[in-house]
């Protein structure tokens, strides 16, 4: 699957809008009661479990008293989000779709164990709040500001996709305007983070994880009850472009030399994705902040390793996608519904709303909504912590007698970042609205391609015994971002939105084909080499 630039014809757009109205009528008042009840229950329970918030350690690290299994469940809930819930089934449902996305799980597991047994002991040498504190201690304040800026940029880009995904769910089942959905999502995420910091975030994540699994299992049971698994397997054998295709195929050994733009291959999974996942779980504060909530290296290591079971959730949602494809081959949708299914991202929420019993459909969709919020409240806590660390430093944050003042300030910063993230979601919707065939999974991973490589490069510079210069790291970061911008489709879209259609068309015409995943190791190497080369000139030395 590639994230390409497509435009819906006006007729398709009108048909899609008509479909939204038809679908949301199936969402009954019982569903609304279930959704409202679940959200109220989760909010109240999260508040009750938040504990005391007397200082910054309580707010951002949960007092370092959280059990490892809750931290692991929170990591899985954050990783999954609504992106997996509707993006993965939609990806399989597409006529050319299959299970090859599952191969990426190998790279994910390799990276988690590498983080658990190599990186966590380094982080626990000192009392720190983020990997950026670790890098700042070793490379200086300039490096800390660089990686914090990269993290903030990558978070806004990546999480805005998750805001968009959740808005799609709400739009399909409620008929509300997508922009209003985005504002509601942002407001709930701010509220949950504001209430109790990481304690609330982690415990609500555990609840979301349980409901998310329940929703996926229930959907699969209902599909298999209607169609046997053998029938689902048979119906997933199709002909695409005159060739037979098994939509349950999950292995692909095509090399990047044969098809450089192909992303779901074993070579990408084993070579490129370990770098992406090592950065995601070892450098991205969205996930690493959970490790710091554990009371010991042993607990943090267990939390990280056991989070590998998330691959089973991916298998579950791939199976749901195959089931949905078979379902609609047997139960052909109306022309209006079929028109909206050209955007595979609408398939699962539409099926839930129309085919699942009232009340149960509300519960499943509440789980999808809450799973999305669990990712967003996590990133708000992470952005707040890293921002305060840069502007105040750990000494001021931990100063005796200023604990409650810092907690109040943290909550204000959470609100500010919440508004920024909501605005980014609105901006992304403006782009997606005219390109609704985009592969959301590819879009999410493509967004982090801008920053993950440089982040990993700076971490390597902090760990390796070499001379580096922060200015070189900045140069490498700029080169990396420019390189990704050349290969990715977002820049032409932005230029087109600004009215620079000539430039956009020219850039699209001359854009090379290469899967975004290869930029994780490539840009890490570029950033590290630039820092090392400038450091070798003797302009600066690593402390």
Predicted regions: what they are:
Residues 17-543:
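Membrane-embedded helix-loop-helix hairpins and adjacent transmembrane boundary segments
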């Amino acid at each position: 699957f590639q994230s390409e630039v497509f435009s819906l014809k006006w007729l398709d757009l009108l048909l899609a809008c008509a479909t939204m109205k038809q679908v949301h009528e199936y969402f009954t008042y019982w569903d609304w009661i279930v959704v409202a009840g679940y959200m109220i229950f989760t909010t109240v329970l999260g508040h009750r479990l938040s504990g005391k918030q007397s200082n910054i350690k309580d707010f951002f690290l949960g007092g370092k008293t959280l059990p490892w299994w809750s931290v692991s469940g929170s990591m899985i809930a954050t990783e999954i989000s609504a992106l997996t819930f509707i993006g993965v089934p939609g990806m399989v449902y597409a006529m050319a779709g299959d299970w090859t996305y599952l191969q990426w799980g190998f790279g994910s597991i390799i990276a988690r164990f590498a983080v658990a047994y190599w990186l966590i002991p380094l982080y626990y040498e000192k009392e720190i709040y983020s990997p950026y504190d670790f890098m700042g201690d070793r490379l200086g304040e300039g490096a800390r500001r660089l990686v914090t800026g990269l993290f903030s940029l990558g978070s806004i880009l990546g999480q805005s996709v998750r805001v968009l995904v959740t808005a799609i769910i709400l739009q399909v089942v409620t008929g509300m305007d997508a922009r209003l959905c985005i504002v509601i999502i942002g407001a709930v995420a701010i509220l949950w983070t504001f209430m109790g910091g990481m304690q609330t975030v982690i415990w609500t994540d555990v609840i979301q994880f349980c409901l998310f699994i329940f929703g996926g299992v229930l959907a699969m049971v209902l599909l298999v009850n209607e169609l046997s698994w053998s029938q689902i397997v048979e119906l997933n054998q199709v002909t695409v472009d005159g060739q037979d295709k098994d939509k349950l195929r999950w292995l692909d050994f095509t090399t990047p030399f044969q098809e450089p733009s192909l992303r779901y291959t074993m070579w990408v999974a084993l070579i490129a994705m370990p770098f992406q996942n090592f950065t995601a779980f070892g450098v991205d504060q969205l996930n690493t902040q959970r490790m710091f909530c554990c009371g010991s290296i042993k607990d943090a290591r267990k939390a990280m390793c056991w989070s590998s079971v998330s691959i089973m959730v991916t298998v579950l949602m791939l199976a749901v996608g195959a089931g949905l494809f078979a379902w609609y081959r047997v139960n052909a949708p109306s022309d209006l519904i079929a028109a909206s299914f050209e955007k595979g991202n609408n398939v699962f929420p539409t099926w839930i709303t129309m085919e699942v019993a009232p009340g149960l459909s509300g519960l499943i969709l509440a789980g999808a909504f809450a799973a999305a919020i669990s990712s967003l409240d996590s990133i708000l806590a992470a952005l707040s912590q890293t921002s305060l660390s840069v502007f105040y430093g750990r000494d001021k944050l931990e100063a005796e007698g200023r604990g409650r003042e810092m907690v109040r300030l943290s909550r204000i910063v959470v609100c500010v970042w919440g508004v920024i993230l909501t605005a980014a979601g609105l901006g992304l919707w403006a782009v997606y609205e005219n390109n609704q065939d985009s592969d959301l999974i590819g879009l999410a991973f493509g967004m982090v391609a801008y920053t993950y490589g440089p982040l990993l490069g700076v971490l390597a510079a902090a760990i390796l015994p070499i001379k580096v210069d922060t200015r070189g790291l900045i140069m490498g970061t700029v080169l990396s971002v420019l390189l990704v911008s050349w290969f990715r489709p977002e820049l032409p879209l932005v230029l087109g939105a600004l009215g620079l259609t000539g430039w956009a068309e020219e850039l699209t015409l001359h854009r090379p084909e290469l899967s975004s995943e290869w930029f994780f190791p490539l840009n890490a190497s570029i950033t590290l080499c630039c820092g090392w080369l400038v450091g070798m000139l003797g302009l600066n030395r690593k402390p």
